[in-house]
Amino acid sequence: AFLYAVPYEMYEKYHVRRYGFHGISHKYVDERTRRHFNNPHLKNITLHLGNGASMAAVDAQGHCIDTSMGFGPNEGLLMGSRCGDIDSAVVFFLGKKGLSNDEIAEIFNHESGMKGITGSSDARDVEALAEKGDPNGILCLDMYAYRVKKYIGAYAAALNGVDTLIFTAGLGENASIIRQLVCEDLEYLGVKIDAEKNKSLNHPSDIVEIQAPDSKVK
């Protein structure tokens, strides 16, 4: 999972590979969850959803087998000002349009994501726009949740099943609408969220379970 399909010498010579980020956060919430359920053999998907965002798949032995960020922190999820996954052809296209590498990097890392779609990198502003019916605010939340769902599906396949979805960081802990949108239509995976528990959760100081009583996934 850590290798890119580029000439292997790029890895040997320049160490071009996927590294991932937010490792301390992913490791901490994974270990806390195993202790919380008194089960060291859980298959966990950890979701560090903040202004920067990443996910990780942790197998039943506690090994992280995949993570959404790669060589740099721009790969993967839609973020506050980062675009996340994007076709490399866009880089070449913008270069032909006269933009420098530094200008493209600035756009992808500081002018994209939520900021690029709504004008603000603050998820609270995006939520407020969506609540008012602003099309771009609604679009942004839908795009955000869709990207997260894609990774949940991919990681569930890589893990051969999933026992828990673990939300952490600013949006993961405090944005009930994000958790709701992410968990919607995941019943086929055994994910059922308790709407009332989810809405009432705010600034938790410890692990809080928000699954419905009949949810197979915690």
Where are these regions (language model features)?
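Buried hydrophobic positions in well-ordered alpha/beta secondary-structure cores of metabolic enzymes
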Residues: 61-62, 108, 148, 167
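Glycine-rich beta-strand-to-loop/alpha-helix junction loops that act as flexible
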Residues: 49, 166-174
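Generic beta-strand/beta-sheet core signal
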Residues: 47, 67, 168, 194-196
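General structural feature for long, well-ordered alpha-helical segments within catalytic domains
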Residues: 25, 29, 54, 87-90, ...
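Glycine-rich phosphate-binding loop of actin/hexokinase-like ATP-binding domains
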Residues: 2-96
